A protein has these predicted regions:
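Conserved Rossmann-fold NAD(P)-dependent oxidoreductase catalytic core, especially the SDR/UDP-sugar
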Residues: 85-127, 134-137, 142-144
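Conserved beta-loop-beta element that borders a ligand/cofactor-binding pocket
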Residues: 128-156, 167, 173-179, 211
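NAD(P)H-binding glycine-rich loop region in Rossmannoid oxidoreductase-like domains
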Residues: 44-86, 90-94, 107-114
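Short acidic-glycine-tyrosine-enriched beta hairpin
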Residues: 328-352
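N-terminal Rossmann NAD(P)H-binding glycine-rich loop of SDR-like oxidoreductase domains
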Residues: 1-26
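Substrate-positioning beta->alpha
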Residues: 156-164, 181-201, 222-227
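A short glycine-rich, His/Asp/Glu-containing loop-to-beta-strand
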Residues: 266-305
Length: 392
C-alpha cells in the first residue's frame, strides 16, 4: 500500500509515520496482512509540485496538514480549507478514488466555546469539501473531529496545555493554571494512531452522523492533570510508583511526561544503606503492591534471622550463590533452598517463619532482588529477630 501523509512533520504526522515505518520495515509484525510499500510525506517544506504526483499514486491518504496558530487569521483558510481543496482536486484530476482521512477538529462544531472560531470555521469548510468530494466521486471520506491531543513529541508552549505542563514541570519551570476545574476531553496519541491504522484496513469507528471518531478519550480537569504530573516528578525522590491501571489516563500521561525529561533527569541516584555486611537499596515503592529492593551481601555473610506476622517477601538471587533457610517459629524443621544467579528462582519468605540468606561464596558478592508485599513502615516494621537454627 502506498500511503500519502500531509503534515508529516507535525505532532500527529510524526507519530503516524513512525508507526507506519515500523510496519513497512517489519519491526511491527502485529498487523496481519497490512503491507506498507511506500510512504509519501508532504509538508510545508515540500515542493508543491510533488503533491500531484503523490495523489496520482496513493492508495490511501492521511490529510493531517493544517494551520492552527497563525499570525494572521486569514491563514486559517489558506492552510486548512484551500489546501484541502488543492489535495482533493489533485486526486480527482488523477482519477484516484482512494480513501481520504481528514484531520478536523472538535472546534468545527462551532458550538459552545467554539462559536465564531475562525479556526473551526476553516476546518468546517474543509469537512464540507471532503464530504462533497466523496459524494461526487464515490471515494471513501473519513472525517475525524479530533479533541485535544497529548503524547510524545507534542510541541510545548504552542497548542497543547498538556505538552506545556509536561515540559515545564519536567524542567522545573512554573506553570499557570487559570482554573483547575476546567475540564478537557483528551485523546492520547497512541490511541489516535491505532485508529488511523485500523482505518487503513477498513476498521474505522464511524458515528451515526457520518463522522469518524477515536473511540478512546479521557475527560479530566486541569487540576487532575497537574496533580498527576507533580506526583510523577516527585517519584525519583519518594520512590513511589503511582497506580496506573491498563488503559488509564494516568498511565498514558506518565509516558507522555517522561518524554519531556531533560537528559540530566533521565538517571537519578538511589540511597544505598551500607554496613559491614553489604548494602540494601530501596528501588520502587507502590501504594498497594509493596516495594522492590536490592540486597548485596559480602562473601560468607548471613543476613536476615528475623520473621514477620503478615509481611512476606520474594527473594530472587541474580548474582552469586546463596542458601536460603527458613523455619516456622514454633517448629524445628528448617526448609532450605540453594539458589544461584545462573538459574534465577523466586523463593517466598513465609509469614510466621524466621528466615536467613547466606552468601556461599568466599570471594564474590551476592546480589538479591527482593520484593515485599508492603512498604517498610518504621512505626510498624513487623520484623522480629529470631535465628533460623532452632538450637539458638
Amino acid at each position: 500500500m502506498r500511503i500519502l501523509i500531509t503534515g508529516a512533520h507535525g505532532f500527529v504526522g510524526k507519530n503516524l509515520v513512525a508507526a507506519l515505518e515500523n510496519i513497512q520495515n517489519g519491526c511491527d509484525r502485529t498487523r496481519g496482512t497490512l503491507a506498507v510499500t511506500e510512504l509519501m510525506l508532504y509538508d510545508k517544506e515540500s515542493d508543491p509540485a510533488a503533491l500531484a504526483d503523490y495523489c496520482a499514486r496513493a492508495d490511501f491518504v492521511f490529510h493531517l496538514a493544517g494551520v492552527n496558530r497563525p499570525t494572521d487569521t486569514a491563514e486559517f483558510k489558506v492552510g486548512n480549507t484551500d489546501l484541502t481543496a488543492t489535495l482533493l482536486h489533485a486526486l480527482e484530476a488523477a482519477g484516484n478514488t482512494c480513501p481520504v482521512v481528514l484531520a478536523s477538529s472538535v472546534q468545527a462544531t462551532l458550538t459552545g466555546r467554539f462559536t465564531g472560531s475562525a479556526y473551526g470555521e476553516s476546518k468546517r469548510a474543509a469537512e464540507v469539501l471532503c464530504f462533497s468530494y466523496a459524494e461526487r466521486t464515490g471515494a471513501k471520506a473519513l472525517v475525524y473531529r479530533f479533541p485535544n491531543l497529548f503524547g510524545k513529541w507534542c510541541r510545548p508552549n504552542y497548542n497543547s496545555a498538556v505538552a506545556t505542563f509536561c515540559h515545564n514541570i519536567a524542567n522545573d519551570l512554573p506553570i499557570t493554571v487559570s482554573d483547575p476545574a476546567i475540564r478537557l476531553e483528551l485523546a492520547y496519541i497512541d490511541d489516535l494512531i491505532e485508529e488511523m491504522i485500523a482505518a487503513l484496513s477498513g476498521g474505522e469507528h464511524r458515528l451515526a452522523d457520518g463522522f469518524c471518531t477515536v473511540p478512546v478519550t479521557h475527560s479530566v480537569t486541569l487540576g487532575e492533570i497537574t496533580d498527576l504530573l507533580y506526583t510523577f516528578a516527585a517519584q525519583p525522590t519518594t520512590l513511589v510508583m503511582p497506580e496506573m491501571a491498563e488503559g488509564s489516563f494516568a498511565k498514558k500521561l506518565y509516558s507522555t511526561y517522561l518524554s519531556y525529561l531533560p537528559a540530566r533527569k533521565v538517571a537519578y541516584p538511589l540511597t544505598v544503606n551500607v554496613d559491614a555486611r553489604g548494602s540494601f537499596t530501596e528501588l520502587i515503592k507502590t501504594a498497594n503492591c509493596g516495594q522492590f529492593s536490592v540486597n548485596v551481601s559480602k562473601p560468607g555473610i548471613t543476613k536476615g534471622q528475623h520473621w514477620h506476622h503478615s509481611k512476606w517477601e520474594l527473594f530472587i538471587v541474580v548474582a552469586g550463590e546463596a542458601l536460603i533457610r527458613q523455619r516456622r517459629i514454633d517448629d524445628s524443621e528448617v526448609i532450605e533452598h540453594r539458589v544461584s544467579g545462573k538459574t534465577p528462582t523466586a523463593v517466598a519468605m513465609l509469614p510466621g517463619y524466621t528466615h536467613s540468606i547466606v552468601n556461599l561464596s568466599d570471594t564474590e558478592e551476592l546480589v538479591t532482588l527482593m520484593w515485599a508485599n508492603e512498604c517498610f513502615d518504621k512505626n510498624r516494621p513487623d520484623t522480629f529477630f529470631k535465628e533460623v537454627d532452632p538450637c539458638n
